[in-house]
Structure formats: structure tokens, C-alpha cells
């Protein structure tokens, strides 16, 4: 069996203020590769995750087995979801309920009594309670339909204690956040070796070693641990299982890498997600480690060749403000000369860079006032006539923020070429371009883009024009890029990535 230990620390957020964003995780990427190849795997969950079943559904993850530290401590052994509504709580007889779009506010005699917060699927995440307008406690609900944890707060609205419950409402463990000490309910003394622990990590480690991985077969099983500096469990506790530590740019790992490197006695198995991580590992440990990309290719060719207008995608997430403005200005100079032939979509991940994209467009309008109009700002009939009479070009320039993998697929479907001029290559963007079959213009050399084959390396922003000229309006070069990308798709397919995993798993 393949056991994976992900670094999943965060709980689900209050969606009333959470801005949708795309997230990447090395464990999820490994899991997708296993699932694509129908290779069984188990998850070892070390963090408190009351909404785990919801998370797995959102990620379309179906492990063969889930070994969960807090499920063991709380006596839960199933994944059956159960809906809990606000009516299931015991409210004072004179409670009034104020329903809003995102939560329910409970009032008693005109005073705030409680506030119920929901997730994106309408399930209750938690209930906050108040006394004299002061936040006193929070009840977190498990997606399987029970109160899982109670959080107590001081007068400064800081959490002081976590109390964990089972499905029957009995408390199992109490965690003092100021001292990190843990008390185990004597009613469940057979669950653990001790009733008191100085550190929560000691209890969690005991559960993993004595109850979750106690049947680990060193000859046939494999343990893949995401190395992460935020984990509550010291990574050296896994060394007895001869693990493969997965390191990626998505999780800080330098501190724990130093710890396990000192304790492993030169018998450390590490895995990097890209060349950059490989170089950092080699610099810190001196080890040459294998690389398995996190993102697999998918044969999903775009349809830009069916469009008369060639759309340029400019990805600015990793560019500075000045670089983004320069690149947009450069592409504008192309569009204004042939507005019917080319278009521009500025792409970002974050809300901050989306604002930069809008600023770039506004700067164009300010610097070139009267020289063009945006196609998105549809003029009325009179303005349309005046535009045609004065030959003011209508330019197709827009900005799009990518928040899901599906969204990037929709955006790339109509792109003719993509520019990623950040200091480092964005691997997800890159593998999507390869899967879509479109060329890429990059700032740095990398193993996926071969100069003047499926892209052009552009050391300076002014070089971008040369790369655009090479592929746009030239079907021969574009088709050559497509053929090269199809070959790369085979190299980065789920089957090929699984072959790399099988090589690592051979003992």
C-alpha cells in the first residue's frame, strides 16, 4: 500500500468574505497520478480536519483508506455525511433569527446571542456564541453531523482551549493552547498510553506510530510524506518507515529538511517537484534527488486555429508592476496596427494582480486617449458610426483571473500563444499550455520549452515581439510547436509519471 501524509493544515474558511483562489498541493498532485493509473493509496491525516469529507469531494479524491489521527481520538470510524441545521440546536425560547445571505444571526432580547456560519455548500461550519457582545466560544461542526470541537476565548477574543468531542457528545481530549498540554478523558483511558501529555505533538505521534501505521509493512508498503515546516509532528518520527519526503514550492520545508538531514545518517530519500526545488535541496544537503512534476499533461488541444483573431495570453502573476505595464504597452503597439488580427487577454491568479491588470488597461486608455476604443466598452450606434468614420481601431483587450483548473482550461482554449515572463516558470500554466498545444514565450530557459520549437526564450521584454512574430500569422511555425507539444504530452502523461513513481518505489 502507498501511504501519503499531506500537509493539510487549514480549515475551511468563512465563504462570506473568502475570495476564490486557485490552490496547489503536492500531495493532491501525487494522488491524481495514482488515481489516473488506478493505483491504490491511503491517506494519513495528522491535522484536525472536521470538513475532510467535504474537502475530498471537492478535490474528487477517493482513497482506499483514510487513517485519521483525530478520528481515532474522537472515536469516529466512518465518512457518512449528515446534515445539521440550525433547528437542531437548543436555543432559548425567545430567540429571534436574522437570516442573511451568508450566515444566521441569533438574537435574544435584542442582544447578540450567536452567529451561525456556513460553508459554500450550505453546511454549518461553526457557531459563535456571545455574552454581553463578547465572543466567548465557538462550536465547530464535523461534516459528518456532530459538534467536533469547542473553542473557548478570553476577553481579548483569543482562543485559550480546544475541547474535542465524539459523536455522542462526550469530551475526549482538552488542549490548553497557552501551555500546549493535553488532558485525556479518563473514560477513554484505553485509547492512549497516558492521560496527560506535555505537548500535543507527543499525543499525535503516539497515535500515528501505535494505531495508524502499526501494521506498516517495510517490504511492501511505501510512505510519502509532504515535508512542511508547519506540521505539528516532527518529520524525524517518520524515519523508521524509510519514507520518501516530497518537497515543493507550495510548502516551506527548509527548517525541517535541516533537521531530518542531520538525523538520517545519509539515508534520506527526497523528491523534488521541479528544477528550482532540486537546486535548493542540493545546495542544502548535497543530494542529487529525483524530480517528478506535480502537473500531468492532458490531451486537450485548444481551438484557436478555428478563430480568425489570434489571441495572446499574458500571464502577469509573477511580474512586477513595471514589467507588466511594459509588456502590455508592447503588445498594444502590435494590436493597434492590426486590431482585427490580434487580441490580448491578461491572466492572473490573485486579486492583487487582477487589480494590476486593470491598472495596465486603464494606463493604456490614459496614455493613448482617443487612439483606440476597447471592444468590451460597446459604443452606442452614433459612436459606432463616428468610430468607423475616423478609423479609430477597436481593440479586444481584457483581463481574466484564474480561480480553478477548469477556468484555465476555458481561457487557454481560445489562446494562440501564452507569455509567462516571470522570474520563474509557472508549472501549472506551462503544462496547461503544453496540453492545449500552444507555444510559450518564457523569460528563463527550462526543460519544457525548446527555443524556436514550442516557444521562444525572451531574456528581455523587447524580445517578446520577436517571439510573437515567429508564431503569429505563421501557421508553419505554430504547427511545428503543436507537434512538439504533443510529444511532450506523452512524457508528462499520468502513465509516464507513474513509471517514475514505480522506479522510486523499488527497494
PLM features: what roles do these ranges have?
Residues 1-218:
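Long terminal accessory regions outside catalytic cores
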Residues 211-217, 238-242, 247-270:
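Membrane-proximal helix-turn-helix segments that form the acceptor-binding/catalytic region
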Residues 263-289:
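A short, active-site helix/loop in glycosyltransferases that binds the activated sugar's phosphate group
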Residues 294-381:
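Conserved catalytic-core segment of nucleotide-activated headgroup transferases in glycan assembly
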Residues 385-429:
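Donor nucleotide-activated moiety binding/catalytic core segment of transferases
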Residues 414, 418-479:
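Catalytic binding pocket for nucleotide-activated donors in carbohydrate/polymer assembly enzymes
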Residues 477-491:
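A short, well-ordered alpha-helix in the C-terminal region of glycosyltransferases
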Residues 491-507:
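C-terminal alpha-helical cap of glycosyltransferases
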Amino acid at each position: 500500500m502507498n501511504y501519503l501524509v499531506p500537509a493539510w493544515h487549514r480549515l475551511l474558511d468563512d465563504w462570506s468574505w473568502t475570495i476564490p483562489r486557485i490552490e496547489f498541493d503536492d500531495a493532491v498532485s501525487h494522488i491524481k497520478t495514482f488515481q489516473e493509473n488506478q493505483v491504490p493509496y491511503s491517506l494519513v491525516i495528522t491535522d484536525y480536519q472536521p470538513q475532510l469529507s467535504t474537502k475530498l469531494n471537492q478535490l474528487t479524491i477517493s482513497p482506499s483508506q483514510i487513517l485519521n489521527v483525530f478520528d481515532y481520538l474522537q472515536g469516529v470510524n466512518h465518512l457518512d455525511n449528515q446534515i445539521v441545521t440550525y433547528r437542531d440546536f437548543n436555543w432559548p425560547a425567545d430567540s429571534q433569527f436574522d437570516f442573511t445571505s451568508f450566515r444566521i444571526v441569533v438574537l435574544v432580547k435584542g442582544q447578540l446571542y450567536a452567529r451561525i456560519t456556513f460553508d459554500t455548500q450550505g453546511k454549518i461550519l461553526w457557531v459563535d456564541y456571545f455574552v454581553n457582545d463578547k465572543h466567548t466560544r465557538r462550536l465547530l461542526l464535523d461534516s459528518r453531523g456532530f459538534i467536533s470541537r469547542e473553542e473557548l476565548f478570553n476577553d481579548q477574543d483569543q482562543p485559550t482551549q480546544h475541547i474535542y468531542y465524539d459523536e455522542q457528545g462526550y469530551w475526549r481530549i482538552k488542549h490548553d493552547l497557552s501551555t500546549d498540554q493535553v488532558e485525556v478523558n479518563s473514560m477513554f483511558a484505553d485509547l492512549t498510553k497516558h492521560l496527560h501529555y506535555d505537548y500535543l505533538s507527543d499525543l499525535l505521534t503516539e497515535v500515528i506510530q501505535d494505531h495508524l501505521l502499526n501494521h506498516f509493512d517495510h517490504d511492501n508498503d511505501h510512505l510519502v510524506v509532504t515535508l512542511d515546516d508547519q506540521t505539528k509532528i516532527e518529520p524525524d518520527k517518520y524515519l523508521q518507515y524509510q519514507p520518501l519526503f516530497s518537497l515543493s514550492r507550495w510548502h516551506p520545508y527548509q527548517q525541517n529538511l535541516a533537521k531530518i538531514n542531520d538525523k538520517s545518517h545519509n539515508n534520506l530519500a527526497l523528491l523534488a517537484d521541479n528544477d528550482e526545488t532540486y537546486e535548493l535541496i542540493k545546495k542544502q544537503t548535497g543530494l542529487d534527488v529525483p524530480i517528478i512534476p506535480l502537473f500531468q499533461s492532458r490531451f486537450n488541444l485548444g481551438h484557436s486555429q478555428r478563430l480568425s483573431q489570434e489571441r495572446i495570453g499574458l500571464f502577469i502573476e509573477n511580474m512586477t508592476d513595471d514589467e507588466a505595464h511594459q509588456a502590455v504597452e508592447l503588445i498594444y503597439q502590435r494590436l493597434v496596427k492590426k486590431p482585427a488580427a490580434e487580441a490580448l487577454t491578461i491572466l492572473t491568479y490573485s486579486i492583487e494582480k487582477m487589480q494590476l491588470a486593470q491598472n495596465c488597461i486603464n494606463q493604456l486608455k490614459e496614455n493613448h486617449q482617443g487612439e483606440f476604443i476597447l471592444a468590451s466598452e460597446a459604443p452606442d450606434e452614433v459612436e459606432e458610426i463616428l468610430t468607423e468614420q475616423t478609423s479609430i481601431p477597436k481593440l479586444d483587450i481584457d483581463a481574466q483571473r484564474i480561480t480553478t483548473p477548469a477556468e484555465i482550461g476555458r481561457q487557454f482554449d481560445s489562446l494562440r500563444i501564452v507569455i509567462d515572463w516571470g522570474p520563474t516558470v509557472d508549472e501549472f500554466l506551462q503544462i496547461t499550455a503544453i496540453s492545449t498545444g500552444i507555444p510559450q514565450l518564457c523569460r528563463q530557459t527550462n526543460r519544457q520549452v525548446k527555443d524556436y520549437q514550442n516557444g521562444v526564450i525572451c531574456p528581455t521584454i523587447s524580445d517578446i515581439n520577436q517571439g510573437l512574430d515567429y508564431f503569429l500569422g505563421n501557421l508553419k511555425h505554430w504547427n511545428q510547436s503543436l507537434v512538439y507539444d504533443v510529444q511532450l504530452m506523452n512524457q508528462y502523461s499520468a502513465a509516464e509519471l507513474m513509471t517514475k513513481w514505480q522506479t522510486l518505489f523499488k527497494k
